[in-house]
A protein has these predicted regions:
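Membrane-interfacial loop-to-transmembrane alpha-helix junctions, especially the N-terminal start
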Residues: 40-56, 104-115, 156-167, 214-220
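C-terminal transmembrane-bundle signature of multipass membrane proteins
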Residues: 151-220
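Membrane-interface helix caps and helix-loop-helix hairpins in membrane proteins
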Residues: 8, 73-76, 124-136, 180-187
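Membrane-proximal helix-loop-helix units in multi-pass membrane proteins
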Residues: 79-150
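Internal transmembrane alpha-helix with an interfacial aromatic "cap," most often the third helix
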Residues: 25-39, 64-111, 204-207, 211
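Aromatic-anchored segments of alpha-helical transmembrane domains
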Residues: 56-63, 116-127, 166-179
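Residues within membrane-spanning alpha-helices of integral membrane proteins
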Residues: 18, 51-58, 113-117, 143, ...
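N-terminal topogenic module of multi-pass integral membrane proteins
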Residues: 4-76
């Protein structure tokens, strides 16, 4: 009984950390949704993809909170949403940072092709049983695009600082902390969620800041 109680306690701690992460991402979705509503029609495909980049981790974290707190049978759905966040959400944010930093105004069909391409490469590497390697490559590439987008605004410092802060938290969470086992008395997945919680608001701030400093648009 004691072991079962301890397991439930740690399960509830993960539900709590997932819930806090979901709330942080949801706040980002609300704020970015205002940008989408006020954007010009040609800018809305980009803002839609940015919103998707935050909505996927918000959904994954919300389902995770319910899974670890109430309904363990939601594990499959939670895993699917978590993979979508990794293989689709973060890359979309990296591409958005690139387009904003370079002042590129990609049209809806361009964003559609990028979405389809990400889905196609996911299926390809799944068939090749190389998803772990592809995930690492995709996430590191996305973080580099975020940093590049911030660097393109130099000598304005804030975009680069935001990109460094968000990327640093994501790298530390993914490569150092991980999600399996414990770090002292703390479950690693809870610490992982705690690091992602400030990372996503920093990413939202970066997107808004890059959009505000965009001075011209090159239509592709």
């Amino acid at each position: 009984r004691l072991c079962r109680a301890q397991g439930l306690s740690m399960q509830y701690s993960t539900a709590l950390s997932d819930g806090v992460l979901a709330l942080a991402c949801l706040i980002c979705v609300v704020q970015l949704g205002k940008r989408y509503a006020g954007a010009q029609p040609e800018q809305r495909p980009r803002w839609f993809c940015i919103l998707l980049g935050f909505a996927l981790p918000a959904a994954a974290a919300a389902v995770g909170a319910v899974r670890f707190g109430l309904l363990p049978e939601l594990g499959e759905l939670h895993g699917w949403l978590s993979r979508a966040s990794s293989f689709l959400g973060l890359p979309l944010l990296g591409l958005a940072a690139l387009s904003l930093g370079r002042n590129w105004q990609w049209q809806g069909p361009t964003w559609g092709r990028l979405l389809l391409g990400l889905c196609a490469f996911f299926e390809l590497f799944r068939q090749l049983d190389r998803l772990d390697e592809y995930r690492l490559f995709l996430q590191l590439s996305s973080l580099l695009l975020l940093l590049y987008g911030g660097l393109l605004r130099w000598p304005q410092r804030r975009p680069l600082v935001l990109a460094l802060g968000a990327s640093g938290l994501l790298v530390f969470a993914g490569l150092v902390v991980g999600t399996d086992g414990f770090l002292g008395p703390v479950r690693r997945i809870d610490l992982f969620h705690a690091l992602l919680t400030p990372a996503y608001p920093l990413l939202a701030w970066l997107m808004i800041d890059l959009a505000q400093t965009q001075s011209r648009a090159n239509t592709l």
